[in-house]
């Protein structure tokens, strides 16, 4: 399947969604966005390492403008506690 999915929020929920999208071959391109860029980049590295035996996909830690052209945008960010 050739689809682009953006996940906004790289916390527990957002990172799990991104991992599931990658591991189940649901999307061919995933953009993970978080206010904490380092957090998003770390989660992307973990997902890439955890899905190394799957078909290659594009997964990046990005900015809001990288969401352009997404087929689906998932907002998993919430209010800071």
Briefly describe each language-model feature range:
Residues 14-15:
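N-terminal Rossmann-fold NAD(P) dinucleotide-binding loop
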Residues 71-76:
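N-terminal Rossmann-like NAD(P) cofactor-binding module of classical short-chain dehydrogenase/reductase
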Residues 21:
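Aromatic pocket-lining residues of Rossmann-like dinucleotide-binding sites
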Residues 33-69:
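Conserved N-terminal Rossmann-fold NAD(P) cofactor-binding segment
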């Amino acid at each position: 399947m050739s689809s682009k999915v953006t996940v906004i929020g790289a916390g527990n929920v957002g990172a799990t969604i991104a991992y599931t999208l990658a591991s189940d071959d649901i999307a061919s391109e995933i953009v993970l966005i978080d206010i904490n860029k380092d957090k998003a980049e770390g989660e992307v590295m973990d997902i890439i390492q955890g899905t190394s035996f799957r078909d290659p996909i594009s997964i990046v830690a990005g900015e809001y403008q990288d969401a352009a052209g997404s087929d689906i945008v998932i907002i998993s960010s919430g209010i800071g506690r």
